[in-house]
Amino acid sequence: MKIRNSIYFPLVCALALSASSCIRDEILPCPPLSVRVEVTDKNYFNVHETDLEEPVDENLSFTGYISSLRYTLKNIATGDVVERKDVRNFTSGEKSFRIDFCDTLPHGTYVLTVFADGRTEKPLTFDETGENLKLHPDSSEGGDTYLTTDTLVYDAWSYDYAVGLERVKGKLLVLMESLPSDCAVADHSVKGLYDHVTPSFIYKGQSAVMKSLSVSEQDHASVLSGTLLSPSAGGGESVFSLSLKDNAGSVLPGPHDSAVKVSLRRNELTLLRYSYGSGGKLVISLYVNDHWEVVHGMEID
């Protein structure tokens, strides 16, 4: 989303303007192109439907949501990259980050793309083209990434814009209850995820994520894991698997590696619950429509 402020000069001033530029020796210089980068997705869409994820304060400064960003301004007519910059240290306490481009920038139509990392302090990783953001480099979880892309028309009347960063990934929360006493590690595997996102906010490719969670004795009663994940590839379903291991790295006997199909979406929380009982009993539930529904095998009951 972008907001444009248009300034209309009096007729006498308008006659002094050429079709493409200001006559700088007769009037004040044309204002430079300026863009305020704001955060649109401060919370997950469904964060208020569960108490397993704490909502974020909606009134923080920009640095309360974003730790680093990269912006790119590209000229549509020529395809040239006019400016690209990485920003890691924000000094302002404002609720937006302002980009002021050089006042010698020619009037024209541009595309502004901003990739950003949330408060995860993870580096932004791009593919070999340097354009597309890798969402799960080396099958890792990666950071809490944001993106905005907008077309900006820059002329004597249109030069002040606002754009909003939107969260690229969702989050999978897995609640594990009554874990076996010899459980030391919970291995997570998620297959069927998008691999990268383009500057046009189009998801492409396929990837998988592997993650290990150390489990202490105090966690056996109940432990919660959270994993940042790209949406399910093709708009379909991803497959989540959980495997429990002991201190020696051996997989524990019993139905601990049951797989579940889940639909992962950007800026949404997906909740699973693994409840272990005596005799190797395992009940898997998926949180749907404000309540837990038991999952049998790969289907919801």
Show where each model-derived region lies:
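Structured interaction patches on ligand/partner-binding surfaces of diverse proteins
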Residues: 91, 119-160, 248-280
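Acidic/polar, low-complexity intrinsically disordered N-terminal segments immediately downstream
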Residues: 24-109, 121, 266-301
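C-terminal motif of bacterial Sec signal peptides marking the signal peptidase cleavage site
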Residues: 18-21
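Bacterial N-terminal signal peptides that target proteins for export
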Residues: 1-9
